[in-house]
Amino acid sequence: AAKIIKVQDMALKTGSPVVGLIDSGGARIQEGVASLAGYAGIFRRNVLASGVIPQISVIMGPAAGGAVYSPALTDFIFMTAATSYMFVTGPNVVKQVLNETISPEELGGASVHAVKSGVADFVFNDDENTLRGVKMLLSYLPSNNIENAPYLATDDPADRIEESLRDLVPEDPDKPYDVRNIIRLITDKGKFLEIAENYAPNIIIGLARFGGYVTGIVANQPQVMAGTLDMNSSVKAARFINFCDSFNIPILTLEDVPGFLPGADQEHAGIIRHGAKLLYAYTRATVPKITVVLRKSYGGAYIVMNSKGIGGDYNFAWPTAEIAVMGPEGAIAILYHKELAAAEDPVA
């Protein structure tokens, strides 16, 4: 722990990113409480470095017990399929306490944390590709919160015309499409580093370049759940926006959202509290913020997705944009509820 703390202190002093390669079974219990104090020192420095220098955790094997908390405090977590695991209590403890038999992969494997928990931001098939992914991510990030993200000269003209963009957003408001196709057409060389690709896929987040300058992208994904906002997507996007704001990375929002996901499950689990995190992140961010309304922009979700009212710097509307207090079906149900109740066939 003392070695790790020394590196963390030096990184903060020099304004350098920290990459941690983690393969740990937890605290060495032979050292008693002293081992816990070592963990505490690491965690404290993770917190002090948050928003000051980029912190990346690479899980190269098991990360159990106290070893999982440091990665959880960092900005990005990489895992390797079939060889890396993260859990607070391992399968043996689960068996003893709950009498449940579960494998390390089922409990805290890469697929679990990439799809279900959202703990893992990137998953690769082997260690070599995992480390390549770390290098790719670092190529988009500044060394600290004082510097700007690396500029990369490009021969891709900013004013190029993409005729196919005219037809990518369907005129039918209920027809799904993949917003990634739009992202690839507008970014430099069509490159886009997507983050947390398999978690809360109804919203897309990632890094790209425009004219050589790094930009964070947040985009509703109509292909999944019609692009509605739920708890997981709200938290996912809010965390990314906070990171971009900390490290001077402008944010482009591509909006096509019919609203927040309705239902008792979402309400009981705290959609109000979690949805507010996205609202707070956008409002608090001081980096340049641009929004393009691609199609739907309804109700509270319209406000949350970087509307001008909460501080959006420039807001543009695609030709297919629809901005309203709610969708047409909901508006009809409220405005004409008496007529509908009296009608012989309300559906007609």
Residue spans of the language-model regions?
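Ligand-binding clefts of soluble mixed alpha/beta catalytic domains
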Residues: 1-348
